[in-house]
Amino acid sequence: MTGYENKRFVHRKELNTEWEALWIWRSRRVRVNDFAYFRKEFSVRCPLKRALLFYSAHHTAAVYVNGTRLGGYVSPAPTNPEKRKAYLAYDVTELLADGRNCLTADAHYLGGSGQNYYDGLPGFRLQLQLVYEDGTETVVKTDASWQALKEMPHAVGTPYQQNRRVSAIEAYDARKLDPEWRYAGWRKEGATVKAKPALIGSDDWPMEAQRIPEGAIAEEIKCVKLPQPNGGEAEFAQVFDAGAIVSGWPRLALKGVEGTVVRLRYSEDLDENGRVKHNVTNEFSDRYYDEYTMRGDELETWQPDFSFKAFRYVEVTGYPLEIAEGGVTVCWAYTGMAQTGEFSCSAEHLNKLYAACIRTQKNNTLGQTVDCPHREQAQYTADTDLQAEALLYNFEAVEVVAKTLADFTDAQLEDGTFPFVAPINYENPDFHIQIPEWDLHYATLMWKAYEASGDVGILKNGYETARRMVDYFLSIRDADTGLVPLDKGWHISDWPYPSVEHKGQFLTVQQIKLVLALRAVGRAAALIGRAKEGGTYAEHAERLSERIVEQLYDRERKRFRDSSESDARHQGVTAIALAAGLVPDEDRERAIASVAEQSWECRTVLSLPLLRMLFDNGREAEAFALLDRTEYPGWGHMIAQGSPTMWEGWEDIESHSHAWNGYPARLLQEYIVGIRSETPGFAKTTIRPYMPDSLTFAEGKIATPFGPVSARWERTDGGVRVRATIPAGMEARLTLPLADGRIVEQALTEGENEMFFAK
């Protein structure tokens, strides 16, 4: 799947509806991991011009029209419903028939104060607007006339699968749902009760059309059945390998054995006996499974798709028969954004690195950008800022990033700071956490989304949030030093397993990130008509930059100290300072050389500014060497170990599908292929490749607001051949450094460009 396409899904930003429908639930009681099964019959008279169906749920629902399931999965996308509640819209005209029709919905409420959502209250809301050819209109809406199933196939109150209470075990008993339930004419005395008004008032939650695509099944993976596990267990276990870690769920297609409880357990890895481990990455969990109780049909199919799981291996227990090929399929699912980026070159390990970055990014876009798709599924500003590198170059993802910004706007605290993730149950003591450095990424993420899209609306929407955030940090500056001291929360300069020292009250990386945030806020203000404020924030950034140099720069060694009382001069601290332009001009070349020639000590967070600084300052060879290496540490080491996804850090010990390590994909496209934006929105674009001696060709394509841009360079016996495709409306140039020291400058035209440069 290159993009999610559902013809019934109405995906228009301007689509709105006046809500008449009530929020309903099956009772007035709030229970964790609760379900409700709803049903409504109604009449349609043809000819029907158009039928639009709108629905929302807290937290998710699956809606059926005459037995046909609508749309995608794990919908609506998570938000703080008190600030905005997403709803979906579908054109269902073709699904309705003359006469009696039936709507059904299966809704799920999580509750439980988990890490990556907002508890809110249970509820389901649907409105079907029927427009006839004669101009008349009718509305079918949720109210007390809807039926709710008394005894549901989904068990209520099942345990959470992770320690962070992200998703619940689906325990589904197929015997409890009559197959005719979803069709008009079903009758069963005493099987239903009238739906109750939910505890949510009709106007309590602001309704907003969902702007990002729904979850979609991208690929149905035919699993490889592994040999029977060792260990002599009495339990009959059958283990299946999807070939890589995927987000999604398994699908069963098995001969039914009535009353048999089939358990599906998930993990990234296996134990020494070939069984699926009882864990969620590096955290123990005995509950990372779902269960299906069989009805006894000749063929039964089922998939636990109310939540995203992430795993490579599926272990089936409880089923007494040998499972043949096709009995277990893994559905790889994620937010259905179109992939438009590409990269390939003559080095296969770099092609595998790019593919692993993209696969990992897909795994971590699940209605929100998440750090990992299994342990937390949580949305962090810093993680999204790093992910935005690959996201915005390779996918139609501006709306996905905009949702992250909106989620943090909704979560912003009174003083302008943020919880460490959003959405979140911040009142839960387990998740009452803040990371000050991560707050500062809000402003740089906002600017990054603007640079990719050229859409000033992103700045208008995020400016007040970003302004309030930087104002907080300005308000706590130390009067003597002018620097921001250690404050509430958990401070991170680099991650994971960092070696940056945090000694004293003032952390250098935090100061530099505040400078970058102030600059972003200042530029944003200027672009949205608030020039005076823009000038003020630019002045704050300049003064803070001066204070950082005064207080934290070692002029003798041409390096920045890690913190105010540290004797360490970490590579990454000076790298981010160089990237931010804070090193005095007279020392800059020596500082660049010092960082470039040092052994690699940065982790994931500081390796991005390190690489960008090297590529942008004439040290392309050193930067490429870090991308190209296959030994520890680095991304290539993961590939050399056979991993098809990116890990949380360099070590093979925690999450093995962590998207913040996916930014090498963008760096390969931007620096090796050479596709670079010169102005926000790619109105001006330069093709300037770095052509390392170890490669004979490299090619790539990226998404821009004007359309795709592609480029390819290739060495031949006689010279270098370059091809570039430029969309209409874009101003583009080729800047090509040749081996003899010449730099070729040439304008590119709309459409195909092919050039050859002799040795």
Q: Which residues does each predicted region cover?
A:
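Extracellular/oxidizing-compartment recognition motifs
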Residues: 1-375, 383, 399-402, 415, ...
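Alpha-helical support elements that line or immediately flank enzyme active sites
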Residues: 51-52, 249-268, 306, 317, ...
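Short helix-capping and inter-helix turn/linker motifs at the boundaries of alpha-helical repeat units
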Residues: 32-33, 242, 378, 436-437, ...
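Active/binding-pocket-proximal capping segment
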Residues: 61, 70-73, 77, 408, ...
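C-terminal capping/lid segments that line or modulate ligand- or cofactor-binding pockets
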Residues: 155, 163-172, 376, 394, ...
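Active-site acid/base region of carbohydrate-active enzymes
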Residues: 60, 125, 143-151, 323-356, ...
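Non-catalytic C-terminal accessory modules of carbohydrate-active enzymes
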Residues: 127, 141, 147-182, 186, ...
